[in-house]
Amino acid sequence: MPSPKLVNGQVVYNNEQIRPIYSGNINDVKVLPANQIYGEGLFFAFDIDKIKEWSETYGLENYYKTTLENGSMGEFLASEMGIYGRAKYYLLHTFSHLIMKELEFSCGYPTASLSERLYYSDEMCGVLIYTADGAEGSMGGLVWQGQPELIEKIIISALQRASDCSADPLCWDNSDGLNKAACFSCAMVSETSCEQGNMGLDRRALVDPEFGYFKDLI
């Protein structure tokens, strides 16, 4: 698959197998099909400037580029990460999974009832963890966990739990699998809950003693 290109702030793919859902000029499209979901969620926004500074300080773009070049990452996702930032993606995506798993451990939410939405581009860096109406835990409990005193404990507990895995040291040092330093024991969730099929996860982006973004919190 050819690499996507950034044209006028939009990602464009030059491939006959990838076609838009509309025909004609994109500027003439006023309505797009969508699904409206009723439920509740927690939104986490990251400071893009701080993440950029963190990535540059530790040279993480080159570090993760080497990881992607071993062929373990899908070309589509690898190309997108090359445009918007590899370190930023690993940080955002892994954080999302760790919070979902921590909500399961500390609050009783099964991860299969939760979903993520990654807001990931050159201008966005955030994640929405939500549950749809009718799913388990969609009666106000998820929003309740967003109170400052509760969500702080959840985040710190998730980071502390991510420092160890029952599959370590193999999980922490693994560089040949689908994900680097991630498995179902520590960071992977149900594939119905993940936007990217559990690809692009690395606990070290968050908790590595040398370059982890949250290393000073644990």
Residue ranges, per PLM feature:
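Extended, well-ordered protein cores
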Residues: 1-218
